[in-house]
């Protein structure tokens, strides 16, 4: 398995809806912001992260459409200006995900289910990393950081992955936890 964290998906720009809603729909932006932050992990540390857009990759213009609490850091601004390094047009299936040691779940779009992507991650044989987000799925109460998954964000991701790499027991616990979630909850 590749020792990196894997994710593929979309960052969608909601600017087309701004005129209809009298301003940028910042309430719909949390998932995109998390996705752009995860893409910044790849830009900063490709040896640990294989996180790319394979569909749309059009982030919000944070200067034109600022959203409270959703500012971009320097790497995120760089990606906004030129996203060529974090694009991958290939479509990946579950066997492709199984080639990675870690799989990442990021918040989804408000017009789709967050759990739709997460449901297939539990059974690919990799440790599941969940982006730390206020979004809650129906089975989240049954999940426990360190037992079923590891929670990460922009600032903790690398340290969490390095700690799991340094502890085969913790990593094995996450694999067993993912199998349990797949068997009992999905």
Predicted feature residues:
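Phosphate-/polyanion-interacting regions in eukaryotic proteins
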Residues: 1-86
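Catalytic binding pocket for nucleotide-activated donors in carbohydrate/polymer assembly enzymes
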Residues: 91-186
């Amino acid at each position: 398995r590749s020792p990196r964290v894997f994710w593929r998906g979309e960052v969608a720009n909601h600017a087309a809806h701004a005129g209809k809603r009298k301003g940028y729909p910042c309430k719909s932006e949390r998932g995109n912001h998390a996705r752009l932050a995860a893409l910044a992990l790849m830009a900063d540390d490709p040896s640990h992260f294989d996180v790319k857009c394979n569909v749309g990759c059009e982030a919000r213009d944070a200067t034109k459409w600022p959203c409270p609490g959703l500012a971009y850091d320097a790497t995120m601004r760089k990606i906004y200006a030129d996203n060529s390094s974090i694009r991958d047009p290939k479509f990946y299936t579950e066997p492709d995900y199984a080639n990675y040691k870690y799989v990442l779940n990021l918040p989804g779009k408000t017009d789709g289910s967050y759990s739709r992507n997460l449901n297939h991650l539990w059974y690919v044989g990799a440790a599941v990393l969940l982006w730390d987000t206020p979004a809650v799925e129906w089975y989240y109460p049954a999940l426990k950081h360190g037992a079923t998954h590891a929670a990460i964000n922009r600032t903790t991701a690398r340290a969490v992955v390095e700690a799991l790499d340094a502890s085969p027991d913790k990593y094995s616990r996450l694999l067993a936890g993912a199998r349990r979630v797949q068997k009992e909850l999905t």
